[in-house]
């Protein structure tokens, strides 16, 4: 069956009786493909039938599907003619692991972050209505994403606007409790029955046409029927908001879903279709351990084991172990995660101190303000969040934490380049938004040992502290340089003359190679591990200005607002005779690919840095 799918809407040529076979073939294709390239597997195995049903009742690309997060859109990509793209999934120059409008006109919204699909879909809907156009808009959102407040803001707005809009709730039992009990099953079956749904719609239309009293009668009916159902049907939450609720329906039963989706197309106004799916369906390792197959590297299909050999502890591992150690020493230390206990390394802290770990769901804004309250209450909160996700909480960091000078620690994982997940996940902006915040201290470790020391320093410090560290194996080099962490002080690794190389965090590993090459060429550069991006070590800058002509700053962050710009501004004001060469990421989004390859592409590899220094010196 799968060989018949080569372009959008080829699915309409497949007989309904053949859909189960097609679903099986798609699952096998996904397992084989992702085992070679890595990617998001469990979530995609769970939505095969759901995606088939949607594509069968819609007319793409005229109709629009907006995927929340987008990591579950692999079947959608297959059905829109991109099977061949899976050979280079998430590779440089290859197909993205997320929806990309530049890839296909069937991809309606570039995705990667959570809880925004209803907002984006509603925007499409209103534009459609304003322009007098006629197409369907479907937003697909997971139950986990409904823990994000933005989703409820959009639901509230959708209910107010009362325009035709379908929202598919993909419930894989991550956040919403399953419906249980005989009465619940009966009422759910009744509610999904075609006759009942049709009768409800027709009766409502008819009554509303009755002058003066019609609308009041409908409202009264809704109030009187809700008392029992409100206790049993989870959909009453949505009904009370003003949305029509349909479901729940088995997300692996094609006929039931297509029937319900067609009913949803008849509903006037916004409608929620509740679909129950199972993550990892069709592949036992992913079904039993969906977290391990959320985002996976290449793996052995027979065993489910990763093919890559772990070279050593990751920065996340180092943070995880340090949190447990510090938690034993200080009973006031608590951890906060936004639905990422595994990803941020806080699972071990939870096991050691179950009452001191708070998982707030996909709610970064709430996480930060919650941390502010905890700090005011007398504890020391550590907010562990990926760099690209923390962007959502900039206002809360600035207003709720920094303005009050609260002792909140931000453990910012996945800072800098992350590789295969691409633009939406690269952590290239945090130094820029962190350093603009008054009272914020910003640190970046050169290796795993320094991350431990910085976390310990932050626990005993005062005011807001941010530590940004990258994805991947923690660097174990330069461990002979292990001076104490002192507030606002950098670490001089090698003292030379004329040229000073100032590196931030992970780029210290790269700059170590640069220094060796410069020495091989007869130069004697000074090599500085910045440690603190804010405050700058102006005392050291003043000292180096006495016998150096060039400062070269290197960071894995956008140049705008980064470490290099701050150093350049200070030197221009205080030591204009010293030239500053900031080496950073130009103001752009960095696509997916291997980190080493991306560095070479954007000018952050050791050879690129050497070339930049030589070119700059020649120009002068």
Model-derived regions, located:
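Non-catalytic terminal/interface segments that mediate subunit docking, oligomerization
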Residues: 64, 269, 277-391, 396-406, ...
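Active-site nucleophile and cofactor-binding loops and adjacent substrate-binding regions
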Residues: 38-47, 66-71, 99-118, 141-145, ...
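N-terminal amphipathic, basic-rich helices that act as targeting or association modules
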Residues: 1-79, 243-258, 274-277
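Cofactor-binding active-site loop characterized by glycine-rich and histidine/acidic residues
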Residues: 40-161, 315, 332-333, 337-338, ...
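Long, well-ordered, tryptophan-enriched scaffold segments
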Residues: 173-319
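Structural signature of the thiamine diphosphate
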Residues: 217-285, 407-412, 431-480, 606-620
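Peripheral docking tails and interdomain loops at the edges
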Residues: 298-302, 306-311, 419-421, 441, ...
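Glycine-/acidic-rich phosphate or pyrophosphate-binding loops and their flanking alpha/beta elements
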Residues: 259-262, 294-295, 304, 314-329, ...
């Amino acid at each position: 069956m799968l060989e018949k799918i080569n372009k959008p809407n080829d699915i309409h040529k497949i007989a309904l009786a053949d859909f189960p076979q097609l679903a099986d073939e798609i699952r096998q294709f996904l397992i084989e493909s992702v085992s070679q390239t890595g990617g998001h597997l469990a979530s995609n195995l769970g939505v095969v039938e759901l995606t088939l049903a949607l594509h069968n009742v819609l007319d793409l690309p005229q109709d629009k599907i907006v995927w929340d997060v987008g990591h579950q859109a692999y079947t959608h990509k297959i059905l829109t003619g991109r099977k061949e793209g899976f050979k280079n999934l998430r590779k440089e120059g290859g197909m993205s692991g997320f929806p990309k409008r530049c890839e296909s006109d069937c991809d309606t919204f570039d995705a990667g972050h959570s809880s925004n699909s209803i907002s984006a879909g509603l925007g499409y809907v209103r534009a459609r209505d304003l322009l007098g156009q006629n197409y369907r808009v479907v937003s697909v959102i997971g139950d986990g994403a409904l823990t994000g407040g933005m989703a409820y803001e959009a639901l509230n707005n959708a209910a107010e606007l009362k325009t035709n809009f379908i929202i598919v709730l993909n419930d894989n039992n991550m956040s919403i409790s399953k419906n249980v009990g005989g009465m619940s099953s009966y009422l759910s079956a009744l509610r999904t029955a075609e006759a009942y749904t049709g009768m409800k719609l027709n009766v409502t239309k008819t009554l509303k046409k009755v002058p003066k009293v019609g609308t009041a009668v409908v409202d009264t009916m809704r109030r009187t029927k809700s008392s029992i159902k409100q206790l049993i049907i989870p959909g009453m939450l949505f009904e009370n908001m003003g949305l029509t609720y349909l479901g729940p329906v088995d997300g692996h039963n094609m006929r039931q879903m297509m029937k319900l989706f067609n009913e949803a197309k008849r509903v006037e106004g916004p409608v929620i279709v509740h679909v129950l799916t199972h993550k990892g369906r069709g592949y036992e390792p992913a079904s039993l351990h969906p977290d391990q197959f959320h985002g996976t590297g290449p793996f052995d299909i027979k065993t489910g084991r990763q093919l890559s050999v772990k070279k050593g502890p990751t920065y996340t591992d180092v943070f995880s172990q340090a949190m447990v150690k510090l938690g034993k020493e200080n009973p006031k230390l608590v951890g906060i995660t936004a639905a990422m206990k595994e990803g941020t390394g806080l699972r071990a802290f939870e096991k050691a101190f179950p009452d001191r770990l708070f998982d707030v769901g996909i709610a970064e804004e709430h996480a930060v303000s919650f941390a502010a309250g905890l700090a005011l209450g007398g504890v020391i909160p550590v907010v562990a969040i990926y760099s690209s996700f923390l962007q959502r909480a900039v206002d809360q960091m600035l207003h709720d934490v920094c303005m009050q000078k609260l002792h909140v620690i931000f453990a910012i994982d996945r800072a800098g380049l992350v590789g295969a997940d691409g633009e939406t996940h690269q952590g290239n902006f945090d130094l820029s938004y962190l350093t603009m915040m008054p009272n914020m201290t910003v640190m970046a470790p050169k290796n795993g040992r320094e991350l431990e020391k910085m976390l310990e320093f932050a626990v005993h410090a005062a005011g807001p502290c941010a530590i940004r560290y990258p994805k991947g194996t923690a660097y174990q080099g330069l461990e002979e340089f292990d001076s104490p962490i002192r507030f606002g002080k950098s670490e001089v690794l090698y003292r030379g003359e004329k040229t000073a190389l100032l590196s931030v965090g992970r780029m210290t590993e790269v700059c170590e190679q640069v220094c060796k090459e410069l020495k091989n060429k007869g130069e004697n550069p000074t090599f500085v591990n910045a440690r603190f991006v804010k405050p700058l070590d102006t005392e050291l800058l003043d000292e180096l200005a006495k016998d150096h002509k060039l400062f070269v700053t290197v960071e894995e962050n956008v140049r705008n607002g980064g470490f290099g710009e701050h150093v350049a501004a200070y030197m221009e004001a205080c030591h204009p005779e010293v030239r500053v060469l900031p080496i950073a990421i130009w103001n752009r989004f960095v696509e997916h690919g291997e980190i080493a390859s991306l560095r070479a592409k954007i000018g952050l590899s050791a050879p690129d840095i050497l070339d930049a220094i030589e070119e700059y010196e020649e120009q002068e």
